């Protein structure tokens, strides 16, 4: 049995008519891309293929735009917009709607969520943008037609350090690896990322990193901001103990890590 589109999907379909009614032709130069577009990466080869198709057959599905200043802002159809630019079109079919910032962002997000190649990081950042506009996780879940737990789990990815998010976006680690890193303490996540990348760990092996760390003595307090910053800089777990006087404890787990640390600190054996 076919399933009806849920959440915002019905709203996007309603705004893009199946017939020519309500569709106008606009100069492509009058349309500006949406700076809040949830999707940041587009496959170049796929864009070229779409541009070739547009040159041959034209742009068949209209863009969704809203008036802004002396022109228009793109709401939905970023991939088609970019391909139209590559194809050298002067005019494009479009549907013009007056939309608030929230409505525009919601529609841009749902269009991207309907694509299978949206990255986990882009999805999480899209949800985060909706939260920053005042929606709760429950409201976000209802609008995109997903369970609240799905939204919450996606948002947890944003707790990872930037290096891990970049590795996930580049395809160097999978979402499973990212979830395994979230099982580690914040100050251990960069070390975990390094282990995964350098040793080519599987998701199951990455999940075992927590058990490996569990054998170490338990820390009695949450890491300080300075400890986290030093951990990020050195790529190893660091603890700063004390106030005006104290000690800095750098934890390494192999001779290779120690040698790399010494080189980073400028020590020549």
Swiss-Prot record:
Keyword Cell inner membrane: no
Protein name: Chromosome-partitioning protein Spo0J
InterPro entries: Chromosome_partition/occlusion, HTH_ParB/Spo0J, ParB/RepB/Spo0J, ParB/Sulfiredoxin_dom, ParB/Sulfiredoxin_sf, ParB_dimer_C
SUPFAM superfamilies to which the protein is assigned, alphabetical: KorB DNA-binding domain-like (SSF109709), ParB/Sulfiredoxin (SSF110849)
Gene3D superfamilies noted in UniProt: 1.10.10.2830, 3.90.1530.30
Disulphide linkage map: none
Domain of life of the organism encoding this protein: Bacteria
Organism of derivation: Thermus thermophilus (strain ATCC BAA-163 / DSM 7039 / HB27)
Effect seen on changing residue 10 to A: No longer stimulates ATPase activity of Soj, in the 1-20 peptide
Subunit structure: Homodimer, probably via the C-terminal 46 residues. Dimerization of the N-terminal H-T-H region may require DNA-binding. Probably interacts with ATPase Soj.
CC per GO annotation: chromosome
Protein family per UniProt: Belongs to the ParB family.
Key words, A-Z: Chromosome partition, DNA-binding
Role: Probably involved in chromosome partitioning. Binds to a plasmid centromere-like site parS. Stimulates the ATPase activity 10-fold of Soj; the first 20 residues may be responsible.
GO biological process, one term: positive regulation of sporulation resulting in formation of a cellular spore
Record flagged with keyword DNA-binding: yes
Region entry Stimulates ATPase activity of Soj by 8%, spans: 1-20
Pfam families: HTH_ParB (PF17762), ParB_dimer (PF23552), ParBc (PF02195)
DNA-binding region(s) in UniProt: 137-156
Region (Required for DNA-binding): 223-269
MF-aspect GO terms: DNA binding
């Amino acid at each position: 049995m076919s399933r009806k589109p849920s959440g915002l999907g019905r709203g996007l379909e309603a705004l893009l008519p199946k017939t020519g009614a309500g569709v106008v032709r606009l100069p492509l130069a009058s349309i500006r891309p949406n700076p809040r577009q949830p999707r940041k990466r587009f496959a170049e080869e796929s864009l070229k293929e779409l541009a070739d198709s547009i040159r041959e057959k034209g742009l068949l599905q209209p863009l969704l735009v809203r008036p802004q200043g002396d022109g228009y802002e793109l709401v939905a159809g970023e991939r088609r917009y970019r391909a139209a630019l590559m194809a050298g079109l002067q005019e494009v079919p479009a549907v013009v709607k007056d939309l608030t910032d929230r409505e525009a962002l919601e529609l841009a997000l749902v269009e991207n969520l309907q694509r299978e190649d949206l990255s986990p990081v882009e999805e999480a950042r899209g949800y985060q943008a909706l939260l920053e506009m005042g929606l709760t996780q429950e409201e976000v879940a209802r609008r995109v037609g997903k369970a609240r737990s799905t939204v919450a789990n996606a948002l947890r990815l944003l707790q990872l350090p930037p290096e891990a998010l970049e590795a996930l976006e580049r395809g160097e680690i999978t979402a499973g690896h990212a979830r395994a890193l979230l099982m580690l303490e914040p100050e251990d996540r960069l070390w975990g990322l390094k282990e995964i990348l350098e040793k080519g760990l599987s998701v199951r092996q990455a999940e075992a990193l927590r058990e490996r760390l569990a054998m170490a003595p338990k820390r009695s307090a949450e890491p300080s901001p300075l400890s986290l910053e030093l951990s990020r800089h050195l790529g190893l777990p660091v603890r700063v103990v004390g106030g005006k006087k104290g000690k800095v404890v750098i934890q390494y787990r192999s001779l290779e890590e120690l040698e790399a640390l010494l080189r980073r600190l400028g020590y020549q054996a």
